[in-house]
Design a protein with these regions (language model features):
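Signature for phosphate-centric chemistry
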Residues: 1-214
């Protein structure tokens, strides 16, 4: 709620409310305060205008909103499917490089709003686990959603996803390891060599073969 903040910012809250929407102002100031964290050289902070409870409340709502907009919350529009073309491109490039048999590195730059749904579409564990009931939790009780998925762990500043491929000389078996923000992670695919996965199994999982999933 924005009542406390409005009283801090305005001498006459009643008059201010005629021109200012309290919740919208609170959210906008929160976004500015968050952006300041990306510019430590300025030495500025706005988080002190909020209480810890307010910061947590706004963050849980923002977390749920990001997940719902990406389609990760069960029952929401599956917007993450828009990133299927990106995942398919990653797969085709990997297959081409494997065929060519030469060491290679491919980079793709994007925004956090694209990295989040792509991480879900790949199957990274940090994006999984929201129960079906979370659709209602995300809409009416967003405080619950972060207990399952937290965007801070997926798309911090400079967030990134890496697929690292390995092949033993003379072998056709390609292994792949997944990294999220430089940390090893996993996908719901059976493997006998964790944290590595057989590339053929990963592709089958992406194609929707349920038998290969854990």
């Amino acid at each position: 709620k924005s009542d406390r903040l409005m009283k801090v910012l305005f001498k006459d809250v009643k008059k201010a409310k005629a021109f200012v929407d309290g919740p919208d102002l609170m959210k906008s100031l929160y976004n500015v305060a968050q952006d300041f964290q990306s510019l430590p050289e300025l030495g500025l902070s706005m988080t002190d205008i909020f209480t810890k409870e307010e910061l947590f409340h706004i963050w849980t709502g923002s977390n749920a909103s990001w997940l719902r907009q990406s389609g990760i919350v069960p029952g929401s529009t599956p917007m993450y499917l828009q990133k299927k073309a990106v995942r398919d491109t990653m797969e085709s490039i990997a297959d081409r490089v494997i065929r060519e048999g030469k060491p290679s590195a491919t980079l793709r730059f994007s925004h956090d709003s694209s990295v989040l749904p792509l991480a879900y579409l790949i199957g990274l564990k940090e994006t999984q686990g929201l129960p079906a009931s979370s659709m209602y939790a995300g809409r009416n009780d967003p405080a619950n959603v972060y207990k399952y998925v937290s965007i801070d762990k997926i798309i911090p500043m400079a967030g990134n996803i890496q697929l690292v491929f390995y092949r033993k000389e003379g072998s056709d078996d390609i292994l792949v390891k997944f990294l999220l923000n430089e940390n090893e992670t996993s996908i719901p695919v059976k493997t006998d060599c964790a944290p590595y996965y057989h590339w053929k199994d990963v592709k089958r999982f992406w194609e929707g073969h349920p038998a290969i999933a854990q």
